[in-house]
């Protein structure tokens, strides 16, 4: 069942924050971060870590040797109910310089 109120609230939030969201995406996609480019992937991770922490998220970086570090974030650690897991990646398929 669709919660129309949640959809309306989410759409309104996106509309209010569109410019800052686009600015963040532009910053992230401007970083060369191909899979073998550990330094670039780690730079993307640092940007995301700062963003998450500014939103009150508890973060941790798990160092990796060959590829980009892993980044975890926990919201509302003490909240009741089942947790929700979001997973993503910070690398791209593009070679450095392309």
Language-model segments: residues:
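Acidic/His- and Gly-rich active-site-bordering loop/insert found
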Residues: 3-98
